[in-house]
Amino acid sequence: MNSLQEKFNKKNTKILIIVFICLFILDIFLWFGILKENEKLEMDFLDVGQGDATLIKFPFSGEILIDSGDGQQIKTALSSVKNYFNRHIDVWILSHANLDHYGGFLKLIETNPPQIFIYNGFDSEGTTFLLLKKLLKEKNIPLVTLYQGDKIKIGDSYFSILWPPKNKEIKDLNDSSLILRLVDKKHSALFLGDASTKISDNLINQQSEILKMSHHGSKTATSEEIIRLIKPSIALIGVGLNNSFHHPHDEVINLLKKFDVKIFRTDLNGTIKIIFDDKILIKEKK
């Protein structure tokens, strides 16, 4: 009897030791993963099909999601770049109220709501956008409206809001897009939403290495003047494979090639990770 009890106790002790070791190793991996992803500013230009979504992770200062696609692929896209045990995103920014930019927020709000929601103050008459605002209000999430001249400071980095001006009447939702310039030490990125070429005058002295192309590479949203003003070395295009709009348009691709701009598009490259190091580092997920 004693012999059986000793064997049983030894077996249980071994199991407990193994469980303890596994938990200890898991704990190390979790903490290593959380700390590692906060060392430098990282920007994930997410593959969400025919839409835009960019996750920005600031060093020790939280995360911001700019746009979220139409909702069909946002959870899958985020799961490929975020720690499984940390799904929270601090701030959501909506460039403008088109479904292919805000639809994903509806998929995330029930399980992972933000602390703040930032947008341009221009509402869509669509019922889905009204639903998003209703859910934000129900969860007591502040809706903050930003305009030209405003700034968002996060640690050593900041966003400048270049468009739209306050109290300006804009009929086209695309042209109401929040235009944001992210600056981190010696690197910068410009986000144009879906704004058309009409806004080019507002981009003087806004040179940026990285350009999030407007309106998925549409020829109505890019001109030679804009490329000359911004002088990008990298262009990001959020676009669905074989989309019915034929984005990006050949004219835009040829223009970028003319200026030796490196082109990354989600339909061909998948999610694109950009790390703001001494130099810009780029990793493709596909």
Regions found by a protein language model. Name each.
Residues 2-286:
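Non-globular, low-confidence helical/coil segments that flank catalytic cores
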